[in-house]
Amino acid sequence: MAEEQPQVELFVKAGSDGAKIGNCPFSQRLFMVLWLKGVTFNVTTVDTKRRTETVQKLCPGGQLPFLLYGTEVHTDTNKIEEFLEAVLCPPRYPKLAALNPESNTAGLDIFAKFSAYIKNSNPALNDNLEKGLLKALKVLDNYLTSPLPEEVDETSAEDEGVSQRKFLDGNELTLADCNLLPKLHIVQVVCKKYRGFTIPEAFRGVHRYLSNAYAREEFASTCPDDEEIELAYEQVAKALK
């Protein structure tokens, strides 16, 4: 007889109306992980201005997101992800860890470069900060267009050419994608709104990656509305003056 699954509930940051999903890449990351695991779960949005008594009791002063697994409360996004990968494991649930360690770090400096770019108000520094962001995006593009070891035919003398894989670590979404994609989505939305910047078409690997990701429900349906992201960055994004 199959072991009964404990109740799983993910508490995430609510949007401006206190009900819909707000801007939080960590919340989206865990939302994606649970969806990809194929586990039955509930998502509860928490209005940070008006935390209910139930939420306060479960996680007093705790940072969002947090997870209720049965009667256990889990905090810290990285630890929650590790916990879910350990308890929701094969054969009943898919393993989501990337095969290639490099996939876990690909593109991870993009968000820091983006933050520096968007928070800058000095026009004299803008070009260099934009170049820094472009350089980080180019590194990701190179990774996405370079064949993974498993794509290389050792017996062939021919050049393997450009990788056509859909995601960071192959044709299936992994924990690496759950970490990177929510951040890349924020970069796209905020840069377009506050800097008129879009990811260059020349970065075909990045565009292919995003196109494949938006075609997946686990990513597209967990994204907050663009307006929520824009609102979250309204005070953060500095006007150039």
From Swiss-Prot:
Expression across tissues: Expression is prominent in heart, placenta, liver, kidney and pancreas.
Membrane topology: Single-pass membrane protein
GO biological process: chloride transport; platelet aggregation; positive regulation of osteoblast differentiation; regulation of mitochondrial membrane potential; signal transduction
Pfam families referenced in this protein's UniProt entry, alphabetically: CLIC-like_N, GST_C_2
UniProt xrefs under InterPro entries: CLIC, CLIC-1_C, CLIC_N, Glutathione-S-Trfase_C-like, Glutathione-S-Trfase_C_sf, Glutathione_S-Trfase, Thioredoxin-like_sf
Residue numbers bearing the Phosphoserine modification: S121, S156, S211
Entry-annotated residues carrying N-acetylalanine: A2
EC class: oxidoreductase
TM regions (residue ranges): 26-46
Residues annotated as binding glutathione: C24, L64, T77
Catalytically driven reaction(s): L-dehydroascorbate + 2 glutathione = glutathione disulfide + L-ascorbate; chloride(in) = chloride(out); iodide(out) = iodide(in); thiocyanate(in) = thiocyanate(out)
Region (Required for insertion into the membrane): 2-90
PTM sites of type S-glutathionyl cysteine: C24
Cellular compartment(s): Nucleus; Nucleus membrane; Cytoplasm; Cell membrane
Entry's pH dependence statement: Optimally active at neutral to slightly alkaline pH.
Database matches in PANTHER family: CHLORIDE INTRACELLULAR CHANNEL PROTEIN (PTHR45476:SF2), CHLORIDE INTRACELLULAR CHANNEL PROTEIN 6-RELATED (PTHR45476)
Domain remark text: The active G-site contains a monothiol Cys-X-X-Ser motif which mediates glutathione-dependent redox catalysis. Members of this family may change from a globular, soluble state to a state where the N-terminal domain is inserted into the membrane and functions as a channel. The redox status of the active cysteine in Cys-X-X-Cys/Ser motif likely determines the capacity to adopt a soluble or membrane-inserted state. A conformation change of the N-terminal domain is thought to expose hydrophobic surfaces that trigger membrane insertion.
Miscellaneous note of the record: The protein seems to have very low affinity for glutathione, even though glutathione binding was observed in protein crystals.
This protein's name: Chloride intracellular channel protein 1
Organism from which the protein derives: Homo sapiens (Human)
